[in-house]
Amino acid sequence: MDLAVELKEGILLVDKPQGRTSFSLIRALTKLIGVKKIGHAGTLDPFATGVMVMLIGRKFTRLSDILLFEDKEYEAIAHLGTTTDSYDCDGKVVGRSKKIPSLEEVLSAAEYFQGEIQQLPPMFSAKKVQGKKLYEYARKGLSIERHHSTVQVHLQITKYEYPLLHFVVSCSKGTYIRSIAHELGTMLGCGAYLEQLRRLRSGRFSIDECIDGNLLDHPDFDISPYLRDAHGNSL
């Protein structure tokens, strides 16, 4: 293997900017370093920010299945009083409520999100049912039967000033934070959607270790000093 290519293999930790798709960062990295074998340990929705673990080269893309199963941690803001079809800020508003839950009601509802819970995936998600992604049905205005998944969550309310509810949650693979916001709104009787989302940690990798994702657009940017091995050590 050419030494220049070998040095471009490893794990790159990126802070995904708001408004960009996860795959736009993968394309930017591919163009920057000329290595086509690039994977990840979990995508983020366009409106979300935070840790993206990018896997460069065959040796590291093989780690994808392992890293995808590791726990993740997020900080989020739910917007109470409004419901959207996608459960997030990019969706169509489908309901409004004038009810203003008390702090006591909020804290009581949050107690449900401790430990093992059953969660229903959003219709606007990449979860596959009958060979198609749920969002493919949703975009056609179709609703299809979904099945609950068992996930592990630990949620902590950090701030509440209606209509914004701030919380931090650590969770297992396959947890939809959008669904947590939606479920909180349902339990409170006012509805809610996910206003903001930031991934703070993916497995052992934290936001403090990430580079700004926009740097990948700079043709002269050198990723070599930021590459890590599977244990998180610098290469």
Curated annotation (Swiss-Prot):
Its EC number is 5.4.99.25. GO terms for molecular function: RNA binding; tRNA pseudouridine(55) synthase activity. SUPFAM superfamilies: Pseudouridine synthase. It is an enzyme of class 5 (isomerase). The keyword NAD does not apply. Belongs to the pseudouridine synthase TruB family. Type 1 subfamily. Responsible for synthesis of pseudouridine from uracil-55 in the psi GC loop of transfer RNAs. This is tRNA pseudouridine synthase B. It comes from Chlamydia pneumoniae (Chlamydophila pneumoniae). The lineage of its organism: Bacteria, Pseudomonadati, Chlamydiota, Chlamydiia, Chlamydiales.
